[in-house]
Swiss-Prot record:
Residues that hold ATP according to the record: G179, G181, K182, T183
Residue ranges, annotated region (Domain II): 73-131
Full protein name: Chromosomal replication initiator protein DnaA
Gene symbol of the encoding locus: dnaA
Oligomer status and interactors: Oligomerizes as a right-handed, spiral filament on DNA at oriC.
GO molecular function annotation: ATP binding; ATP hydrolysis activity; DNA replication origin binding; lipid binding
Length: 475
């Protein structure tokens, strides 16, 4: 793909993000890739059939219009499904070691480095239609840092439990943005849990759960489907934000309750906290919030450097002469800040260029090969949706509460704080802010802003809360 096409694709993605909003973009479009542009046709790809069908049904016209704003001659969008990875039979995990030393190595600034180990054997309960597992995604290959330490520790404790043990974190709910390691941890739990024969561990994407339930209804095997699921010792559900349909959500809620009440473990991942999963039934959100909810934050520079080093070590398993000098790793860690997938992609590009051209990796080569992955270092643009999400989490209310007409004290103050932050941290007008808060009048927003301004000047507790929220939004 040419640099021009990549630049166009970046602009189209930015236009699409502005059109649908950050939450919808993250849920449905973050994993969409550009495959090719030919005349009046653009070919895009997504990883699953579910994403393809949903985007075609709900967003096809918006995607086309965003492309036409860039290339007016485009009249057709072809959406395809990328081939799913078919794993070869894996072997048991080996102890994590550095490729050059027999002991585990520590990266600079305390980032733990691990080589990518192969995974233990597991059928993932194919009789129940478990989702495919990637043999690279084990605890051995997971790089820990400040932003993911708690999630890693909780997942590891769950994986090391035995049948009959008391369950401490149930459900364990992990949320994070795209490419920050949620799926890696969930699959690591599955591999480790299935390493022995004692416990039955099943990994399912929300899409797979949904399709399995619908298929069971059509074939009149719903009872067998339910009984099989409830016989699992550890149920692992990924991408919960994609769970759709009232009957499917009701069945998921029943399964969740049955497993937890029976002392079985449930592990779930999504791209947002339970309170922000507004498409889910209130009962499901309440049950999820009652467990351990852990957020995996953005990757700090130390962690990015650790991930890069681990990917280089993994590449050396098959390409022993491959080497990335330390200055290049430092540059990549500073320049590529979005997510772990971009970091892995950068190493793959350097490996390909080095091998195909028989050239050593240099800083100049790296700057040239990864320039489309480097984002300008500009202040983060804060959206009203971000403010609503962060404020709702801070005050333990839902985003829908902030948009509702409820006037209880535990909702009014967070709503006023959110409106105040929207006025001070964004360029939106008072009428626009009012519309984003459930269609309120601009005078309501003005009252909230003046109210919080007055309180902040004399209430140190509230002042500290507001400053904390500002820091969280600006990070």
């Amino acid at each position: 793909m040419s640099d021009t096409e990549q630049e166009r694709w970046s602009r189209v993605k930015g236009r699409l993000r502005s059109t649908v909003g950050e939450d919808i973009y993250s849920s449905w479009f973050a994993r969409m890739d550009l495959e090719s542009v030919h005349g009046e046709s653009v070919r895009l790809s997504v990883p699953t059939r579910f994403l393809k069908s949903w985007i075609q049904a709900h967003y096809a016209e918006r995607v086309l219009s965003c492309w036409q704003a860039e290339l007016p001659d485009v009249h057709r969008i072809d959406l395809t499904v990328r081939s799913a990875m078919r794993c070869a039979a894996p072997v048991r995990e080996a102890p994590a070691t550095d490729a050059r030393h027999p002991e585990r190595s520590e990266g600079r600034n305390g980032v733990e480095l691990k080589t990518v180990a192969t995974a233990p054997a597991s059928a993932n309960h194919d009789a129940l239609g478990g989702s495919p597992l990637d043999p690279r995604l084990t605890f051995q290959s997971f790089v820990t840092g400040r932003s993911n330490t708690l999630a890693h520790a909780a997942a590891r404790q769950v994986a090391e439990g035995r049948r009959g043990d008391s369950v401490m974190f149930n459900p364990l709910y992990i949320h994070a943005g795209v490419g920050l390691g949620k799926t890696h941890l969930l699959q690591a739990v599955t591999w480790a849990g299935n390493a022995g024969t004692e416990r039955r561990v099943l990994y399912l994407t929300a899409e797979k759960f949904m399709y399995g339930f619908v298929a069971a209804l059509k074939t009149q095997t719903a009872l067998a489907f339910k009984e099989a699921l409830r016989g699992i010792d550890v149920l692992v559900i990924d991408d919960l934000q994609f769970l759709q349909g009232k009957s499917t959500q009701a069945e998921f809620c029943h399964t969740l309750n049955a497993l937890i009440d029976a002392g079985r473990q449930v592990v779930i991942a999504a791209d947002r906290p339970p309170s922000d999963l507004e498409s889910l039934d209130d009962r499901v959100r309440s049950r999820l919030a009652g467990g351990l909810v852990v957020e995996m934050g953005s990757l700090g520079e130390e962690l990015r450097l650790g991930i890069l080093r681990s990917r280089v070590e993994a590449a050396r398993v098959h390409h022993a002469s491959f080497d990335v000098p330390e200055p290049v790793l430092d540059y990549l860690a500073k320049a590529i800040t979005h997510n772990g997938r971009d970091l892995e992609g950068a190493i793959n590009r350097l490996l390909a260029h080095s091998k195909l051209n028989a050239q050593p990796v240099t800083l100049e080569m790296a700057e040239r090969e990864v320039r489309d992955l480097v984002r300008p270092q500009e202040p983060r643009r804060i959206k009203i949706e971000d403010i609503q999400r962060v404020v709702a989490r801070q005050y333990n209310v839902s985003r829908s509460d902030l948009l509702s007409s409820r006037r209880t004290a535990n909702v009014v103050r967070p709503r006023q704080v959110a409106m105040y932050l929207a006025k001070t941290l964004t360029l939106r007008s008072l009428p626009e802010i009012g519309r984003r808060f459930g269609g309120r009048d601009h005078t309501t927003v003005l009252h909230a802003v003046r109210k919080i301004e007055a309180l902040v000047s004399k209430d140190t507790t509230l002042s500290d809360e507001v400053e904390l929220l500002k820091r969280q939004l600006q990070e």
